[in-house]
């Protein structure tokens, strides 16, 4: 018997530029706010109604670096992660937050193109990350250990058969 499934899939719009920081071990963490909207027609008034939800998303590792480099306010993105609730104490009061966590088991895919400035240049090229750790020597490249955080097109092929 399965223990359970904790999977969240969102397609939404970044509400702000992602915030990238680095942990003491050098791993990247990116936080962003993702807005999703749904529309329906109110049966009593006949008017269209729209409701927007804002989701807190935390990305870890290589996918966090990619999100920080390519996502900007207004970017549309596909996120696949898990729901987690964190607890901490501030001023003697317990606080909680629930967020979508995207780690090595999760997925992030940019939808559409890279955001452009008015002069046509890529924003990611102009904005540099201020808190990058000192460069570490890279291990030899292993083509079988390719950590691309985008969806595998063959991943859902079993559903189509």
From Swiss-Prot:
Cellular component, GO, one term: nucleoid
Location of region: Disordered: 110-150
Summary of subunit composition and partner proteins: Homotetramer.
GO molecular function terms attached to this record: single-stranded DNA binding
InterPro entries linked to this entry: NA-bd_OB-fold, Primosome_PriB/ssb, ssDNA-bd
Superkingdom in the source lineage: Bacteria
Keyword terms, alphabetized: DNA-binding, Plasmid
One Gene Ontology term from the biological process aspect of the record: DNA replication
Residue span(s) of domain SSB: 5-109
One Pfam assignment: SSB
Low complexity bias spans: 116-131
Protein name: Single-stranded DNA-binding protein
């Amino acid at each position: 018997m399965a223990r359970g499934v904790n999977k969240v899939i969102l397609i939404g719009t970044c509400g702000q530029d992602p915030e990238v920081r680095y942990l003491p071990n050098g791993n990247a963490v990116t936080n962003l706010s993702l807005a999703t909207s749904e529309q329906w027609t109110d049966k009593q008034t006949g008017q269209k109604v729209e409701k927007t939800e804002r989701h807190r998303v935390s990305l870890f590792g290589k996918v966090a670096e990619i999100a920080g480099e390519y996502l900007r306010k207004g970017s549309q993105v596909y996120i696949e992660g898990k729901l987690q609730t964190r607890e901490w104490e501030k001023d003697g009061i317990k606080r909680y937050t629930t967020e979508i966590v995207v780690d090595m088991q999760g997925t992030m895919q940019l939808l559409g193109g890279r955001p452009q400035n008015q002069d046509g240049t890529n924003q990611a090229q102009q904005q540099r990350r201020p808190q990058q750790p000192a460069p570490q020597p890279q291990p030899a490249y292993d083509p079988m250990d390719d950590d691309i955080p985008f969806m595998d097109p063959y991943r859902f092929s079993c559903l189509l058969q």
